[in-house]
Amino acid sequence: LGRAMLRAAPITSGTISFNHGNTKYDVGAMSKMELKEYRKQAQLIFQDPYAALNPRMTVRDIIAEPLEVMELVQTREEADQKVREIASKCRLNLEHLRRFPHAFSGGQRQRISIARTLVCSPNFVVADESVAALDVSIQADILNLLKSLQNNLGLTFLFISHDLSVVAHICDTVAVMYLGTIVESAPTRSLFTQPKHPYTKALLSAIPTLNPEDRGKAQKLEGEIPSPVNPPSGCRFHTRCPVAEDRCRKE
């Protein structure tokens, strides 16, 4: 879904709309020129900070590349100024800009990746498991940085994650997907305290807890996961749902 929103994957059915000011984009029907303008507003933070950065480029050149590709600057001096500004916001200093990616830890590389994503001032950012490849000790630092950038720059994030503790920390609204279909969507606090869908309840019950009274309360889902290529009819979760009814197979 995140890749389709950025037109990095084909949209096989349905529509994706994006509003920016007075302009409304139909993402699936964009021309090449419209797509170029759209990508100034919608960007992606990759999951793996080790694979996402060109090892032959300095950090300065990595961050500046979107500005040059999208023709957002006229001179190198203008590009340098924008790079320094966004680097500072992502907690990178001038010395960092002169180095190559191999000199940095995973958390530092992810900050470089975030700076590259934000240098063209997008409004919408897809963060695809952006802390999953990092040590737990580093994850909190990156999450706090993303939250700070969201508040300071007015960003909207589509934060994709399998880690519900991370989701609870950073998201305002949560959508739970099963076999490619959204089964429940609600404000974060409401979804975590009063889940409605059986799949959401099963996910939340599997979160590790230090409370000994909760030991053994995780719901064990029976049966094999159906193929997303040929999903079940009705509610896609009904083949594994402990409370499924006949109507679930149809609706």
Residue positions per predicted region:
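Helix-to-loop junction immediately C-terminal to a conserved catalytic motif
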Residues: L6
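ABC ATPase NBD Q-loop/coupling interface
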Residues: T15-E37, T75, L191
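Conserved ABC ATPase "signature" region
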Residues: N22, E68-E71, E77-E95, L204-S205
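Conserved ABC ATPase signature
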Residues: F100-F104, Q108
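A short, proline-enriched helix->beta-strand linker immediately N-terminal to the Walker B motif
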Residues: V119-N123
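P-loop NTP-binding/switch modules centered on Walker-like glycine-rich loops
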Residues: S130, L134, I138-G216
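Short catalytic/signature loops enriched in Gly
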Residues: P187-E251
